[in-house]
Amino acid sequence: MTRTVLLRALTKNKFVASNAPRSISISITSLSRCISTLILAEHESGTIKPQTVSTVVAANSLGESSSISLLLAGSGSSLQEAASQAASCHPSVSEVLVADSDKFEYSLAEPWAKLVDFVRQQGDYSHILASSSSFGKNILPRVAALLDVSPITDVVKILGSDQFIRPIYAGNALCTVRYTGAGPCMLTIRSTSFPVTPITANSESKKATVSQIDLSNFEDDSVSKSRYVGRSTQDTERPDLGSARVVITGGRALKSVENFKMIEKLAEKLGGAVGATRAAVDAGYVPNDLQVGQTGKIVAPELYMAFGVSGAIQHLAGIKDSKVIVAVNKDADAPIFQVADYGLVGDLFEVIPELLEKLPEKK
């Protein structure tokens, strides 16, 4: 039955060739490949986010003949800058699709979901991927609801075009999932499981085609359902928590907002990002966007330092891909020591000041 459906799908569509110039607005056409992947790209201030490139790496595992298209949406010059960067962000990207409209100025889920469905209808994609970030988790389920398919979330390994591995039970077990749906296979990718190999800067040798999507027939009746109110950000020179090479995390043992500033000072000296456990966030020491763990940010830095962190399974699930884990805790039986590469049983109120004294200022 599956083979019959596949053969019908392959013979139903015809190859479409186009000699349209690369710079003009064109309609999207299907190349009718067996595996054709659409990736929802995240960008900010004219720059493609690292988790999008990791998603491209994951898409490469779907099959050797897979074609990969990036979908960018937004408005203004920063969108076009991001599109130009996306065209050379990875050799596997064959096309960059750009939706330039005020409707996509903010990453609201409703218009984005309509856009993905609009692009899918014209492109006939077999797979639709997004990073397991707040962006991807917000948009992809809405697209899946529109298409009446079940998305597969938090994929950490791709075994084939229809078989994937994802964590369950707070990361204590791995589940192999096979997709058998009729619609496109939708995945959110845990970016820390698909590291990006540095690419030598041979910029002009491999660059994807950038196409402006023709939105003249795009109808969006969802604009009135939600509206952009505002965005709050923290002014800091520290790197983003999700992509930082060094992460310094504090737990509830720090006892107060004032004491948590020691973690911030240590992070500044090491050029790292600040993280926190759920207990520290719930206690009000830091905002919840700094939470590390299964229900917060999944991190995979070169160095992860945990102070006063006991090691709940939800927290450990969010740091397990870290290269080196250093733990400081008064409790010698704390679960964090079971996963730490280096552990120190001691009082953080003695250890951190000594570290701050001996570490040089970051240049």
From Swiss-Prot:
Its cofactor is FAD. Transmembrane segments: none annotated. Binds 1 FAD per dimer. Induction: Expressed constitutively. Not induced by dark treatment or sucrose starvation. It is found in: Mitochondrion matrix. Its main location: mitochondrion. Keywords: Electron transport, FAD, Flavoprotein, Mitochondrion, Transit peptide, Transport. Signal peptide: none annotated. GO terms for cellular component: mitochondrial matrix; mitochondrion; nucleus. Residues 1-24 form a transit peptide. The electron transfer flavoprotein serves as a specific electron acceptor for several dehydrogenases, including five acyl-CoA dehydrogenases, glutaryl-CoA and sarcosine dehydrogenase. It transfers the electrons to the main mitochondrial respiratory chain via ETF-ubiquinone oxidoreductase (ETF dehydrogenase). Involved in leucine catabolism and in phytol degradation. Heterodimer of an alpha and a beta subunit. Belongs to the ETF alpha-subunit/FixB family. This is Electron transfer flavoprotein subunit alpha, mitochondrial. It comes from Arabidopsis thaliana (Mouse-ear cress).
